[in-house]
Amino acid sequence: MEVAEANSPTEEEEEEEEEGEETISEPRPHTRSNPEGAEDRALGAQASVGSRSEGEGEAATADGGAASVPGAGPKPWQVPASASEVQIRTPRVNCPEKVIICLDLSEEMSVPKLESFNGSRTNALNVSQKMVEMFVRTKHKIDKSHEFALVVVNDDSAWLSGLTSDPRELCSCLYDLETASCSTFNLEGLFSLIQQKTELPVTENVQTIPPPYVVRTILVYSRPPCQPQFSLTEPMKKMFQCPYFFFDIVYIHNGTEEKEEDMSWKDMFAFMGSLDTKGASYKYEVALAGPALELHNCMAKLLAHPLQRPCQTHASYSLLEEDEEAGEEEATV
């Protein structure tokens, strides 16, 4: 008489386990609600879909140092290499913005080199004034709780229009401006002024609690490459590391490089970009001899909310399928 072991499974139990394994491994049918097994593929892809801190753009690069130009030696105005990038995940919400627009008034802004829409030549100041007004009025239509301030930059910075949610108040100060010859660029004074006039919000949990507002500085800058007056103090370092502070740049340059100069416009652009320790700000450069349309395009790209936009290296503005396919081909090479 054969006695079955108490711990050994019976044939019926083995068959049930085999059927269960087949059921788990069997993919869902390709129905209209699940074309080509898209939902099954999405399950595996969800693990790779992350936020800004999980591999988007500059914030998750392995080269966590400050941006520098290849082959260039260390310069005293460069951010120290020890300033590592801060990877922070924040809720992607459309909270109110406090936008501080800093407009350069150096004499280079009055040189008529930009090509306007009708083919004539215009200067960068006129184009910047128009694009700033369009930006402010458009942001106001998106969310009437956004606030705007205007700062003009000469040798020093002046707070021209306080934070206001009325676009007309800022625009009334925008056009009565004159350029001047500037010998230096006091970048440290600009950030000190911003710190005095604004207060960065604080939340109990950065990753889950939306902030009451964010502070964004947009610098429209155009002058020959020069060594800025700047030293990264501890308060400034905290400001740049704050997840609710953003420093966007529109740099208008002459497009040429003089061999006799100590630094080129590329050095200056790289230095300004290196101030962003989170990889969350947007930086654009436009040649002074190019079309004015490029400036308008850059300002239009800055309309996106800084908490909701991707890192700049992941941003795509193409609408045609051809451009999208071309972009995919480039990414797979």
Swiss-Prot record:
Keywords: Acetylation, Cell cycle, Cell division, Chromatin regulator, Cytoplasm, DNA damage, DNA repair, Mitosis, Nucleus, Phosphoprotein, Ubl conjugation pathway. The keyword Cell cycle applies. GO terms for cellular component: BRCA1-A complex; BRISC complex; cytoplasm; cytosol; nuclear body; nucleus. One of its GO terms (molecular function) is identical protein binding. The keyword Transit peptide does not apply. Residues 10-24 have a biased composition (Acidic residues). The modification Phosphoserine is found at residues 8, 33, 53. Residues 1-85 are annotated as: Disordered. The modification N-acetylmethionine is found at residue 1. Its main location: cytoplasm. Gene3D superfamilies: von Willebrand factor, type A domain. InterPro entries: BABAM1, vWFA_dom_sf. Residues 58-67 have a biased composition (Low complexity). It comes from the Eukaryota. Residues 99-302 are annotated as: VWFA-like. Coiled coil: none annotated. Component of the BRCA1-A complex, a complex that specifically recognizes 'Lys-63'-linked ubiquitinated histones H2A and H2AX at DNA lesions sites, leading to target the BRCA1-BARD1 heterodimer to sites of DNA damage at double-strand breaks (DSBs). The BRCA1-A complex also possesses deubiquitinase activity that specifically removes 'Lys-63'-linked ubiquitin on histones H2A and H2AX. In the BRCA1-A complex, it is required for the complex integrity and its localization at DSBs. Belongs to the BABAM1 family. The VWFA-like region is similar to the VWFA domain. Its presence reveals similarities between the structure of the 19S proteasome and the BRCA1-A complexes. This is BRISC and BRCA1-A complex member 1. It comes from Mus musculus (Mouse). The gene is Babam1.
